[in-house]
Amino acid sequence: DIYVIEGKNAYDIVKQFRHVIGRSYIPPKFAFGFGQSRWGYTTKEDFRTVAKGYRENHIPIDMIYMDIDYMQSFKDFTVSEENFPDFSEFVQEMNDQSIRLIPIIDAGVKVEPGYEIYEEGVKNNYFCKREDGSDFVAAVWPGDTHFPDMLNPEARKWFGDKYRFLIEQGIEGFWNDMNEPAIFYSSEALQRQENLPESLQRIPEARPIPGKCRTRCSVLQIIRK
């Protein structure tokens, strides 16, 4: 189809165009700014030192990314109580300096009995499966890990809702990482997978999907804010 749009000016044409395709999400202003990302920042003092260095040297800084060390044992949607005992207050402290903290969220959920997200995922069959129907296990940063099935709408909503934990503490953006999904090793890593039923999707064939779905999960939660 070809659309011809007439308008009084460029603004009017853009307005009509957006009416055709739907309104797009407008990122927050800070997202267009400068960010600092480095593995190894573990405590509040690490982040304070980075922020101070930028300010004292008159270098723009709008975001500091938080790698996996802010978590409790590298578990998604957790914060180390030892290193960040008052996390929401620290987030506000950085916000007062016009610096947003952007925490990483990895694609895998640690296999750990008693870990709420793991227990919920197993109970509701939200994780990717092997051909025999058992939950797929691979090793990533936290050790043995399950991966939320982003082709399952219920699993997507469930995983997306977990972002609220951080949003409610003042977080306004996320670093969704390891969306390939990345794995270090698994029992199937060196085995050929052939003759799977059509209803089963090999990971290489589905690789573009998890990242897209996880981005959608997090953005929808931020918009809800």
Regions found by a protein language model. Give the residues of each.
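Catalytic-domain carbohydrate-binding cleft regions of carbohydrate-active enzymes
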Residues: 1-225
